[in-house]
Amino acid sequence: MTDQENNNNISSNPFAALFGSLADAKQFAAIHKEQLKQQSDELPASPDDSDNSVSESLDEFDYSVSEISRSFRTHQEMCEQLNINHMIQRIFLITLDNSDPNLKSGNGIPSRCVYLEEMAVELEDQDWLDMSNVEQAIFARLLLQDPGNHLISMTSSATLNLSADRDAGERHIFCYLYSCFQRAKEEITKVPENLLPFAVQCRNLTVSNTRTVLLTPEIYVDQNIHEQLVDLMLEAIQGAHFEDVTEFLEEVIEALLLDEEVRTFPEVMIPVFDILLGRIKDLELCQILLYAYLDILLYFTRQKDMAKVFLEYIQPKDPSNGQMYQKTLLGVILNISCLLKTPGVVENHGFFLNPSRSSPQEIKVQEANIHQFMAQFHEKIYQMLKNLLQLSPETKHGILFWLGNCLHANAGRTKIWANQMPEIFFQMYASDAFFLNLGAALLKLCQPFCKPRSSRLLTFNPTYCVLKDLNDEERKIKSVHMRGLDKETCLIPAVQEPVFPQSYNLVTENLALTEYTLYLGFHRLHDQMVKINQNLHRLQVAWRDAQQSSSPAADNLREQFERLMTIYLSTKTAMTEPQMLQNCLNLQVSMAVLLVQLAIGNEGSQPIELSFPLPDGYSSLAYVPEFFADNLGDFLIFLRRFAEDILETSADSLEHVLHFITIFTGSIERMKNPHLRAKLAEVLEAVMPHLDQTPSPLVSSVFHRKRVFCNFPYAPQLSEALIKVFVDIEFTGDPHQFEQKFNYRRPMYPILRYMWGTDSYRESIKDLADYASKNLEAMNPPLFLRFLNLLMNDAIFLLDEAIQYLSKIKIQQIEKDRGEWESLTPEARREKEAGLQMFGQLARFHNIMSNETIGTLSFLTSEIKSLFVHPFLAERIISMLNYFLQHLVGPKMGALKVKDFSEFDFKPQQLVSDICTIYLNLGDEENFCATVPKDGRSYSPTLFAQTVRVLKKINKPGNMIVAFSNLAERIKSLADLQQQEEETYADACDEFLDPIMSTLMSDPVVLPSSRVTVDGSTIARHLLSDQTDPFNRSPLTMDQIRPNTELKEKIQRWLAERKQQKEQLE
């Protein structure tokens, strides 16, 4: 029978339609023939059988319709075998058949396959794949070093198919097995039901072989299996088919976990994390590739088994070394930032290079671009932490354990020495970037309960912060992962041991972790920002001076300025990402609410409305670390300096901050640390609207804050709290308290000025003054009286110091202009320059502060008079005002005429105006005017005449000049009368004179301890500042003083006699 006849017979067979092609049917017949031949060889020859008939059947290859039909029914499995062969070829792209492609049909077989030659030789005549040899075939395929060299065409198509070549010749075996897995999945959806188990088995073979590859990667030459796994995931993320890869990985992971005899699961997977660590550490914040790798890690932190390996992998070699955490995979991620990698080294820094050559708009665009990446970056870190916290109790404990240990190991970042020794600091502790990013992620975790009315917020249990050291098992049971918090100073001393619960909730842990992270990170960076800002200002001034003098140092100074500006812009950008700031503000406002609720004794989960007077129950504050309040203040001050728009857009939440400031600023019972309470005054100054801001032509930049501040319902309590802390910081017990108090009071002056301009606050201040006027003789001097006394003390000291420094500057400037410094050695000249610069800084500080104190006295005296004209305050304020006028308008003013007043914030015109305003405010009181001439040290009629001349010169209003002239005349008349009286009483005996002031006593009193008699006004004034007997330092209060009635009568009799004698002489 000819081939054509055979083909015709087969094609007319109705069963031939079950085959994919005519060639498949012929192949089936060939296989069947081979099997029949094998069966005939195995059976013994029978004499009854006809050898000729069998031989003819085999040799003639008779493809008659009847014979094929009978064979198909008898050997149906042969058809199934063909289909299995084709399916295996389609899935694994391998074959044992290298026959002419023209004899194969293109239907159901891939166009290109890897020919497994060695296996084909081993199997001799079998050129098909089945379920018994497929595993061997896959293994053989995986061992091929270059499968592309073994590709053959399976079809007769002459068209070049690069995709088929690439798929079949895939060299990377992990990627190859994944592709096989995908093709097997596809087959499962297409094959008929009888082939389905075989398709599933092929799918399982891809998984089991992948498991083998991962367990024994050393078998496969030139194959980095773990690199391939990472690259496969990376490609999937970038190609949006990541779910397909993770489905494959899930099954591989499950297979690996079933048998860990060869290698444990962590041993298999740790190389993957090694690769990720190596790649991520070289990436920058603004590189897109970084976020693909983070997505890989996000999957790992969602997958329970990989998450456990990840937590094991990120454990540092030395848990007590804070810097070691930065070297872990999570630490490397947290260290990515726009901050400088090596502090001070701007070379190779990718951000804000040569800022002076960039326009403000270009810098703003770069900043916005970085912020976009930062927001995405922080979201990824947050999701990783959230995944681990939610995945299982084991992973939750693991990540909290890591965070707690990390913070404890880095606790030294806040030490003073750490900032002074950077070379040691960066060997011991993780970086600023690390803590800034960690803080941003933890802030996101806190947002669900960072709402002022959140019931979850009040479930925070402060006793968490005072638990003593626990072992690891106890930490796990109690959910306490922070270490060392019990060594932190709390808001108030503990009176009794707290009752500790069995365990703590996640809100408590999250708040404690986040607040401490901010304390270690954001807080420190803020300090650095302030210093950088100051250094920039100094460099700018020095650079400008060098340019003006054509100094060769100008170029060097410009380079320094450029470098520092790069550091400044990088740091500012890192700290001002809008979403991070908003999240932090939400947390700090919530912390203000929480602390207020603890301060009024609320131990429930629902907030209690604030009311005054405050209740007594506040013992829980003894378990709250001071850094909780310090963070709150520090952040709001930061916003005022570097991101004030957020304060305005979030103004409604600031009322909660005002509640916090009102309660804690004035309450030593609730916040013992006077330094921290003084800082709250700076916080108040930060959040209040500022008078000196230029409003936008379209909308006021302080409108909302002004509304909140003016409508604050507890204005009287806030005013009193501010004045109380002003007084309290006079005596902090700190060895540097004298210098500190001026810095602490600096922000209080603008607050007082703003309060005075608002009706509710001004009336509250006047009420305090009225109370003081009525209780001058109280055992404890009234608050406002002590405040005024300290205010005048400050004014006297500050302006006097400013005058001294200006005089020294004037002398040094004259010496320099005369060329006297040119003859000095370079070192001596540098010392002179440094001295002049130091005097300038000191003069500027004292001038600023004295301007504020005199200005405050100026507006207070406009409506508060009775206290100022009282004898024991009047004398002091008059002597102060006259002394300053003497330097500002008298002959001594020449000594203060430095080159540039503005450089030192010296404002003599404003000072003269304020002093005259005080005089005019109090000049209506006859007693006050009568006291002015008693100032024998500075007062003279000439002084006031000189003052009038200066008022005219500085163009003050005419009505003010006239009023002051009239006041001067009245005082001169009183001075003349007093001079006559003094001449009359000049020979008073020592017994009648005050031992401190050497003036005639009008109200002699006896001090109980020393038994010394002094004038009542003198001792009253002394006790405002120092509640001790001035003669023996024994404790003393006004109620202990007794009038010396007998001496008073003697003085009055003597005065009457002297007066009578004078009248008789006249």
UniProtKB/Swiss-Prot annotation:
Coiled coil: none annotated. Keywords: Acetylation, Cytoplasm, Transferase, Ubl conjugation pathway. It is found in: Cytoplasm. It comes from the Eukaryota. The modification N6-acetyllysine is found at K386. Pathway: Protein modification; protein ubiquitination. One of its GO terms (biological process) is ubiquitin-dependent protein catabolic process. It catalyses: S-ubiquitinyl-[E2 ubiquitin-conjugating enzyme]-L-cysteine + [acceptor protein]-L-lysine = [E2 ubiquitin-conjugating enzyme]-L-cysteine + N(6)-ubiquitinyl-[acceptor protein]-L-lysine. Its main location: cytoplasm. The U-box domain is required for the ubiquitin protein ligase activity. Ubiquitin-protein ligase that probably functions as an E3 ligase in conjunction with specific E1 and E2 ligases. May also function as an E4 ligase mediating the assembly of polyubiquitin chains on substrates ubiquitinated by another E3 ubiquitin ligase. Mediates 'Lys-48'-linked polyubiquitination of substrates. This is Ubiquitin conjugation factor E4 A.
